Amino acid sequence: KGAFKVEYLLKPSLELMEEFLKIGNGHVIHVSMAPELEGAEEVIKYLVYKNILVSGAHTNANIAQTKKGIDWGIRLSNHTGNAQRSIHHREPGALGGYLLDERVDCELICDLYHIHPDMAKLIIKIKSVDRICLISDSIEATGIKPGEYNFLGRMALVDEDGWSKLPDGTIAGSTKDMIYGFRNLVKELNFSMEDAIKMACVNPARLSNVLDSKGTIEVNKDADLVVIDDEFNVMYTFVEGKLEYSKDFNYDYCNPKIIPVRTMKEARGDYIGQC
């Protein structure tokens, strides 16, 4: 379940999913769920019928349950290696199932904290750069100062390095942005810019069925552009050709509703591992 509270988790329900899609009014393009849950088969097959991408997420599925989910229509592994049953030599688990099946693409958090650098390399080597989607897993705490905050429905600590944790030591999402992971792919894992762009831009657009308008710089596509310097600092961001961010704007992008409950110094003794 990751960092989510148990009461926030929902069992797969066709009736509820139909309601979600009605409210979404055509804007729902991706749904994540655990395939081992009762009712998952019906909902997954319904979403596939509706041409909506389904990913296996926050799952304790064994290899057999994972294979069933893929056969029903799961085509993406949600933040691969995190909140998934891991690999054991007698039980490959969800992670093993998603890595082995060629029908499945894999999301990857590349902050090198959620996933060890060598594990990230292994996942990419198994799946290839054409089947990896770089994600941030960023939450509303991204960019805020160290301290204890109330988000995800509970208290969590953001430490001096920007990592977010629950009191029991569980990683609570990420506070790093996409460009941080992109830089790590190039600078720390030694992938080419071209391969990093595939993982960060092209593959996500393909899976989201918007590659005809996004994901690459081409004539007649949306001019969604990020301009960076040699140190991977974001200089400018354009959305459909319109300048939406500039390093010169000097905006405060932090969410003003997120106010620290305690400072880092006051809170850190209550958190396992001292963060």
Model features per residue range: what roles?
Residues 90-108, 112, 124-136, 141-227:
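His/Asp/Glu-enriched, well-ordered alpha-helical/loop segment
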Residues 87, 145, 151, 232, ...:
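Short, function-defining helix-loop hinge/capping sites that tune catalysis or transport
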Residues 64-66, 87-88, 116-117, 203-204, ...:
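Short secondary-structure boundary/hinge segments and terminal tails
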Residues 1-5:
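Metal-cofactor-binding active-site regions of metalloenzymes
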